[in-house]
Amino acid sequence: MAVNDVNVFYGAKQAIKNVGLDIVAREVTAFIGPSGCGKSTFLRCLNRMNDTIDICKVTGDIRLDGEDVYDRHIDVVELRARVGMVFQKPNPFPKSIYENIAYGPRIHGIARGKSELDEIVQSSLERAGLWEEVKDRLESPGTGLSGGQQQRVCIARAIAVSPEVILMDEPCSALDPIATAKIEELIDELRSNYTIVIVTHSMQQAARVSQRTAFFHLGRLIECGDTETIFTNPQHNLTQGYITGRFG
């Protein structure tokens, strides 16, 4: 994805100011910065989740494979299949585990029959590292799983419609350390097939899972580069101050 001069307004308030960056394919890009810096707002621009907010206006250019995602001819439902989203709080549908995964492929016409749908469900759960844990209870409610398992259901649900990009908005913030470690391991495995963008408040998590890191402050992108450089040799004083804990 390529982003150029993006601004976001909520009414008269400007939340994102002139942000531009390239999101590299088959890598994990982490967005870091203090609370309220705009990183989640910017993330939601990438698949037009901000469209659901009446007073939100987005200007600038965001392209997926060269195509303007804000073009008026874009099918937003199709866009959100290509650029999936995993939210901060696990939000499985109030359906069975099977139906949570099958729903997307069914409505998008991806599966041509029950056997193909079964294959997609199994493959998606396998990629999310959950198949062995749930294969004997696929008809059980997705909401009955543990928090970490529910988040992996949500990741499998995104995978099931063959996205190019997966957006993750603080996917581990509601999870315990063991579940967090499983999600981080999963992110590392998924990046060989998907472009992943993750918002995180944890600099340690950004350092562990990402290849590139973007630091936001007061709605502006201050610095973006390879993760090791951002954490060991930042070029901007604001980045240095945040990384070293002088503010947060």
Swiss-Prot record:
Gene Ontology cellular component annotations, sorted alphabetically: plasma membrane
UniProt xrefs under SUPFAM superfamilies: P-loop containing nucleoside triphosphate hydrolases
Topology of this chain in the membrane: Peripheral membrane protein
Domain ABC transporter per the UniProt entry, residue ranges: 1-243
Protein's cellular compartments: Cell inner membrane
EC number(s) from the headed UniProt entry: 7.3.2.1
Main location: membrane
Any GO BP annotation: phosphate ion transmembrane transport
Xref: SMART domains: AAA (SM00382)
Molecular function terms from GO: ATP binding; ATP hydrolysis activity; ATPase-coupled phosphate ion transmembrane transporter activity
Pfam families: ABC_tran
Enzyme class: translocase
Residues annotated as binding ATP: G33, P34, S35, G36, C37, G38, K39, S40
CDD domains, A to Z: ABC_PstB_phosphate_transporter
Quaternary organization: The complex is composed of two ATP-binding proteins (PstB), two transmembrane proteins (PstC and PstA) and a solute-binding protein (PstS).
Function summary: Part of the ABC transporter complex PstSACB involved in phosphate import. Responsible for energy coupling to the transport system.
Protein name (Swiss-Prot/TrEMBL): Phosphate import ATP-binding protein PstB
Organism: Rhodospirillum rubrum (strain ATCC 11170 / ATH 1.1.1 / DSM 467 / LMG 4362 / NCIMB 8255 / S1)
